Regions:
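Catalytic cores of RNA-modifying enzymes
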Residues: 1-103
Length: 103
């Protein structure tokens, strides 16, 4: 994986610990029927393993470089949106979604 610099202005931090990722997913308790809104997927460390356990992930990432990186590793049930979550029109998503983020 190519090196992607952390941008402090967006408060970026990237999870690298697989045990922590597994713990977050376990506590989140995903279901195959779930639609998940992920805030700040970053490099996809949480996104990709979670995508195997839910119906769909809508991942909103502000950093266009990270969006490009995520698109290189396309997975069908992940919808990537390059936007600021504070401006994102979440009403465009059907009701009943869950929210996750490594903030």
């Amino acid at each position: 994986m190519k090196s992607i610099p952390i941008k402090k202005r967006w408060g970026q931090n990237f999870i690298n610990d697989k045990n922590l990722i597994d713990k977050i997913i376990s506590v989140f308790d995903p279901d195959k029927k779930d639609t998940v809104l992920e805030i700040g997927p970053g490099k996809g460390a949480l996104t990709y393993p979670l995508s195997k356990r839910v119906k769909k992930i809508i991942a909103v990432e502000i950093d266009p470089i990270l969006v490009s990186h995520l698109k290189e590793n396309f997975i069908e049930n992940i919808e990537l949106i390059n936007d600021d979550i504070l401006r994102f029109k979440h009403t465009s998503i059907k009701k009943g979604y869950k929210i996750i983020g490594n903030l």
